[in-house]
A protein has these predicted regions:
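Terminal or standalone catalytic/regulatory effector modules within metabolic enzymes
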Residues: 30-37, 41-170
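Phosphate/diphosphate-binding loops
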Residues: 2-16
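Active-site-adjacent C-terminal substructures of enzyme catalytic domains
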Residues: 18, 22
């Protein structure tokens, strides 16, 4: 432990992020490290793609909110291991919540009238497996809109593959 607080380290990171904006016409994306990935627990590759994704949705001016919401969503979901596709679920839900002015306190009530992103529906349906701690049940019900989640390993639902037949087709 260095003894440095994240806020203290964040100051120069924020400064240099602003400086880089002045030279963005020469830039092709995130080229420097940032403490944000530690503060918000956003995987590096996803962080690099997050700003363009947020900007493409017209939320560029709310990027800081999206990063804060990423951390909030991560906590709401029980801090799942963030690898593709689960990191996408956290990011998609964070963007969705900012886009719709949702909070952890109002998402269940207001979410009843909203269509959630496909990745979030797939996650809560169990298509990426089930977290050991389970899903937040009230949120799962709102996201699935009456659809039943699966309770088995998702691969078990796939039809068997006839490799001999596939070999003939290829």
């Amino acid at each position: 432990d260095t003894g440095l607080g994240l806020r203290r380290v964040q100051e120069p990171s924020t400064y240099w992020s602003d400086v880089r904006l002045r030279y963005e016409s020469f830039d092709h994306g995130l080229k420097t490290s940032t403490t944000d990935i530690y503060r918000y627990e956003i995987p590096g590759g996803q962080y690099t793609n997050l700003r363009p994704q947020v900007e493409s949705l017209g939320l560029g001016d709310r990027f800081e909110e999206v990063k804060e919401m990423y951390k909030t969503v991560n906590d709401m979901l029980g801090d799942p291991v963030k690898v593709t596709p689960s990191s996408k679920v956290v990011g998609d839900l964070a963007i969705f919540m900012v886009q719709n002015d949702l909070t952890p306190e109002n998402i269940v009530e207001r979410g009843k009238a909203l269509a959630f992103p496909d990745s979030v529906v797939s996650y809560f349906k169990g298509m990426m497996g089930q977290p050991a701690w389970g899903f937040p049940e009230d949120l799962q019900k709102v996201v699935l809109k009456g659809e039943e989640p699966i309770t088995c390993r998702p691969g078990k639902l796939l039809p068997p593959v006839d490799f001999d037949q596939l070999e003939q087709e290829v």
